């Protein structure tokens, strides 16, 4: 069955009929064509042969195919979806029933380059399979203390260099890594290891390859316009059939593959009619004379309502970089209905600050504090994503000023700042061991760097920090309100120090965080505390086993009746260089 209105005929050609058309029957005036081909079986290749009213004939892959031929082949492949035995019932039940806050520390992964075969039989296919990744990536991420995996698009795509963001198969896990059952096994194993799986999903545009959705019936059908920035087609959100196609795709991944959420790519490009159009003469406007794409807005609300209705416990995340209001607001109140939004402002400000050399940081202190001026206007995730380590932007390590030691110290401090700042967390693969080069999608990560002590110690540091975050409710229970965050000193620009308190539901188990962005050491730094008694240092980024200089605070810190930071009591600590406690 396929939707292909305003054509003369639709036939099915495939390996089961020697690529000779078997014509489908039109279903009234719906534009839908259907038929049954008894000899077709799982694994067979097929396409649609479409003839337009103008007499043009061409072949297309099935928009609704569950599997595809391995690239560079472009045919669809018949898949067997039933028959997989799931073992994630307990995880699924907890996800559906849990309403209380949970930690969110996401490991973002490109499956094709996380790790590759050392000696592949075919150099064009060096990838690990879904099942191999289930045995290697999944336990690694769980052992590292992450709570979720987020996968760059696994939907079928023809070009490796698109990283999966130019899709042809919105219902097909890419055949580069195996069959649909293999991907089910990957998700199943993730759940059995306690990891959620979030899928990057691209409803804003699709690639122009001839076998894909573009000009599917000889003219614009799924698309409404060209995408000027990305060389792709934009979906026509005004068509109910297109909205239904996309929402069905999202629900399919959540139901059939047990995914725990979708991260909607390029939301900003969907919300604005003229996104990426520099020429005023080419711009278009809606009926109210503004640039908002009202059809896309309605689609996003329908999408989020559908996900929350049909996939209880699943989340939706928006990559949205403008100031569009209420992205995570309820649809009934005029919001878009997402559960989370990437905080692109935090990411940009933080990375700009981190690459600033130490003598000049005091003049840019606001880049560290501005995020809290709007920090609870949405439910945010703090992303250090793949987009920040490509196209000449440098790796995170490459941004850090100073010598080798200071670079690692800066990277440790960045990780602590991210994990103690309100909001969910997302880090791209490899940042846990500190590579110096940017990410390259065509080759494996540089795992050999773990043979070097500095990189190995950094990986161990991230593991311990992740576990501290996961096991400390004060760092995530009240992540989206002022109840969980209190500035002790936001204005110490002279010393480039941030001082704040994180609080969960047990107020007496609050955590005080000090972050020093300068290479200076302070031996007697006083911090205000809310209660008398004894305090201890939970974690120190400067600890020797992590590659630090060992400026720690061992033993008991006894509160003294000396007022400080608006509190009646205070403790005196040693502050490490380019470090946090």
Q: Residues of each region from the PLM?
A:
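Soluble or luminal CAZymes and related metallo-dependent hydrolases
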Residues: 129-133, 179-182, 241-246, 291-299, ...
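Substrate-binding/active-site clefts of carbohydrate-active enzymes
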Residues: 91-101, 110-291, 557, 573
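Short, contiguous acidic/charged loop-to-helix segments that flank catalytic cores in large enzymes
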Residues: 170, 174-178, 237, 288-292, ...
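Generic recognition of well-ordered alpha-helical segments
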Residues: 135, 185-188, 248, 302, ...
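Carbohydrate-interacting/catalytic domains
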Residues: 1-105, 130-141, 145, 406-408, ...
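Conserved alpha/beta catalytic core and glycan-binding cleft of carbohydrate-active enzymes
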Residues: 258-260, 275-442, 470-527, 531-542, ...
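Short, flexible loop/turn elements at secondary-structure junctions
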Residues: 6, 28, 39, 110-115, ...
